[in-house]
Structure formats: structure tokens, C-alpha cells
Amino acid sequence: MARKSLMVKAERQPKFKVRKYTRCQICGRVHAVLRKYKICRICFRELAHEGKIPGVKKASW
């Protein structure tokens, strides 16, 4: 419940632009959020393994 309220709070426009921070759209995590996809690294990894993110595949060399 607390995380959900923080997600709603993050959507509001801050008084100063520098106070804005990114949150994962799926789980609400604050750290390690990929700006391009607006999701955290953990959710990104899960969705990439499931093939739900187009153009993303596991690297192998």
C-alpha cells in the first residue's frame, strides 16, 4: 500500500523540476530504472526473457 501511494505521489508535478524522479511503472521500484522503457532492471529482465519487449534479446558472444 505504501509503494502504491508513493507511485501516485511521483506522478504529481513537483514544485521544482530537479525533484522529479523515475519509478518503475510495473513494481514501483526507484533504483535502476531504465528511462527508455520506464521500468526497473528486474522487470526489464523478466519481460525480455518472456519476449514481451520487441527488439530485445539476450546477448551471447
From Swiss-Prot:
Highest taxon of the source?
Bacteria
Q: How is the subunit organization of this protein annotated in UniProt?
A: Part of the 30S ribosomal subunit. Contacts proteins S3 and S10.
**Matching InterPro entries, A to Z?**
Ribosomal_uS14, Ribosomal_uS14_bact, Ribosomal_uS14_sf
- UniProt GO cellular component terms: cytoplasm; small ribosomal subunit
What the record says about family reads: Belongs to the universal ribosomal protein uS14 family. Zinc-binding uS14 subfamily.
Q: Which GO terms describe its biological process?
A: translation
Give the lineage.
Answer: Bacteria, Bacillati, Mycoplasmatota, Mycoplasmoidales, Metamycoplasmataceae
Q: What is this protein called?
A: Small ribosomal subunit protein uS14
Q: Where does Zn(2+) bind?
A: C24, C27, C40, C43
What cofactor does its activity depend on? Zn(2+)
Q: What's a Gene Ontology MF term here?
A: rRNA binding
Function, in words = Binds 16S rRNA, required for the assembly of 30S particles and may also be responsible for determining the conformation of the 16S rRNA at the A site.
Alphabetical keyword list? Metal-binding, Ribonucleoprotein, Ribosomal protein, RNA-binding, rRNA-binding, Zinc
Write down how the cofactor binds this protein: Binds 1 zinc ion per subunit.
